[in-house]
C-alpha cells in the first residue's frame, strides 16, 4: 500500500488526512494518508526511514521553509521561486534510493481562489505575517497584478509594522490577507491587530484559516462592510494540485 502524509506542528486543525483518505476510499485507490505531528524538523528524516512506501508528503506550519534543506531538488517554477515548500514528491531510484522534490501548490490554490474576487480598485495588498505561506501569497498577488506589502510585528526593510497602518495606508491597500495563525481554532477569540474601524466596503479581507469557517478577522471586517473569504477553497485547490504533482 502506498502511503502519503503531512508534517507540521500542531496538526489538530489538519484537513488533509480526512480529505485524502476519503478520496482513496471513494476512488478505490490502495493508499493511506497519515499525519506526522513532529515537534522538530529533524524528525523528518526518521519518518522517511521508517516509511519506505511513502510516495508524497504535504508540509504545513512551521516547516514550509525548514524542510528545504532535506530535499534533493526544488521545482523552479514554484518552490524555488517562492522559497517555501508545501508538497514533496518522493521518487524511487535504483538500489532503494529516493529523490525528494519540493513544490509549492499554495500559490495555485491562493491565486485561483482570489482571482475572481479582485476588482479594478484592488491594486495594493497588505500581507499579515511573514511565514512560509505568506511567500506564496506574495508571488500569487504579483502574478495577478496586485502590489503586495508585508506587515510584521518585527518588520524588515520594505515592510510595515502594525503601528504604521494609518488611515492613508488603509485607504490605499484595499486587499488584506491574513497568513498568521491568529484566530485559528481553538483560539478563536484572537485576530490580527489592524485598525478594523478604517475598513470599508472597498476592502477585501482574505483569511488563509478555515477553522472556524468565519474567523474574528473576517467577522470584524464584515461589520464594516468588507468582503471576506476564508481559506477552505484555497486548501481544496492546493490539495488537488498536490495530487496532480504526486501522480505526474
Regions found by a protein language model. Give the residues of each.
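Phosphate/diphosphate ligand-binding glycine-rich loop within oxidoreductases
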Residues: 2-117
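Glycine-rich adenosine-cofactor-binding loop
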Residues: 8, 104-107, 114, 118, ...
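Residues in the short beta-alpha loop(s) of Rossmann-like NAD(P)-binding domains
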Residues: 10, 154, 211
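Short glycine-rich anion-binding loops that position phosphate/pyrophosphate groups of nucleotides
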Residues: 59-66, 133, 181-184, 211
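Active-site capping/gating segments
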Residues: 112-113, 227-248
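NAD(P)-binding Rossmann-fold cofactor-contacting core
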Residues: 143-160
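Rossmann-like adenosine-cofactor binding region
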Residues: 158-229
